[in-house]
Amino acid sequence: LTEVLQNLGKDQYPQQSLEQIGTRIAKVLEKNQTSWVLSSMAALYWRVKGQGKKAIDCLRQALHYAPHQMKDVPLISLANILHNAKLWNDAVIVATMAVEIAPHFAVNHFTLGNVYVAMEEFEKALVWYESTLKLQPEFVPAKNRIQTIQCHLMLKKGRRAP
C-alpha cells in the first residue's frame, strides 16, 4: 500500500515521504470535501499509517459521495480493513457488496478469497480465487493461493486416511 501511495502523482511530483503525501491529500481534500476519490486516497494513507479508525471515517465519506457504480472501491478497502481486524463475517458482507457492484473486477473476487482463507473456509476461498482467474488469468497471487490451498487440503486429507 505504501508503494501505491508513493506512486500517486509520481509524474507530477518528485519522490515524496508518506507525510508529504498525506499533507498533499489533506490540502486538496479541504478544497474538495465531496470527492470520493480523495477520501479513498486519504483512507489509503491512514491504512498505511496503521490508523484503521481514521481510514474507516474516510471510507464512510467516500461511500457517501461515490456514484453507485464506483462504490466497490471504498467497499473493498473497508473489507480489507475488516479482514485485518479479524472481523471476517463483516468483511465477507462488505466484499460481497463490492462484487455485486463490480462483478468484473478481479480484486474484489480475490479479496473474498482472502477472507475465506482467514476463516479457514478453503473450499469457498478456492471458488473465489478461481473466479479471480476467470476474470484475469494472469493474476499470479490467485494462482499461488489456489496451489497452496490444494496442497493444504491434500495434506489434511492424507492425515485423515487410515
Task: Place the predicted regions along the sequence by residue.
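Canonical positions in the second alpha-helix
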Residues: K27-V28, Q61-Y65, M97-A98, S131-T132
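Short coil turns that delineate tetratricopeptide repeat
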Residues: Q33, P67-Q69, P103, P137
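Helix-start (N-cap) detector for alpha-helical repeat units in TPR-like alpha-solenoids
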Residues: W36-V37, M70-V73, A106-V107, V140-P141
